């Protein structure tokens, strides 16, 4: 396992796929990083030389990934909640923030159903 940005990336997979194990790096970013470094996308991690690994590390260090990115996202959500914006209120209540209907669905965001007692006869 190679260690990049504090994450052990799998050795047996292609470099493009392995880089996506790092939080904040998706397919597109992984391809851009490899293009900047000059490494083929088809190479397996175990076949990388130390120089290539160091170059990839240096390129990824320029990006905001892992802990820094998670912290920034959490601070953005906290800021929205503090200023009392609509999105912040939706975050606080645990509801969808992007305009989806909540009458029937939104179970992922709302959690399991809370059963309400029926009317007694």
Curated annotation (Swiss-Prot):
Native species: Enterococcus faecalis (strain ATCC 700802 / V583)
Region (Disordered): 90-121
Name used for this protein in its record: Small ribosomal subunit protein uS13
Record family assignment: Belongs to the universal ribosomal protein uS13 family.
Cited Pfam families: Ribosomal_S13
BP GO terms, sorted: translation
GO molecular function, one term: tRNA binding
Function recorded in the entry: Located at the top of the head of the 30S subunit, it contacts several helices of the 16S rRNA. In the 70S ribosome it contacts the 23S rRNA (bridge B1a) and protein L5 of the 50S subunit (bridge B1b), connecting the 2 subunits; these bridges are implicated in subunit movement. Contacts the tRNAs in the A and P-sites.
One GO cellular component term noted in the UniProt record for this chain: small ribosomal subunit
UniProtKB keywords: Ribonucleoprotein, Ribosomal protein, RNA-binding, rRNA-binding, tRNA-binding
PROSITE patterns: RIBOSOMAL_S13_1, RIBOSOMAL_S13_2
Binding partners and assembly: Part of the 30S ribosomal subunit. Forms a loose heterodimer with protein S19. Forms two bridges to the 50S subunit in the 70S ribosome.
Biased composition (Basic residues): 106-121
């Amino acid at each position: 396992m190679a260690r990049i940005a504090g994450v052990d990336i799998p050795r047996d997979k292609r470099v493009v796929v392995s880089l996506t194990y790092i939080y904040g790096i998706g397919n597109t970013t992984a391809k851009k990083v490899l293009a900047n470094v000059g490494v083929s996308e088809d190479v397996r991690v175990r076949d990388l030389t130390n120089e290539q690994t160091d170059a990839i590390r240096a390129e990824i260090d320029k990006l905001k990934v892992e802990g820094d990115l998670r912290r920034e996202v959490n601070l953005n959500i906290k800021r929205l909640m503090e200023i009392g914006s609509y999105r912040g209120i939706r975050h606080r209540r645990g509801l969808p923030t992007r305009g989806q209907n909540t009458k029937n669905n939104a179970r992922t965001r709302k959690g399991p159903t809370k059963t309400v007692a029926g009317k007694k006869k």
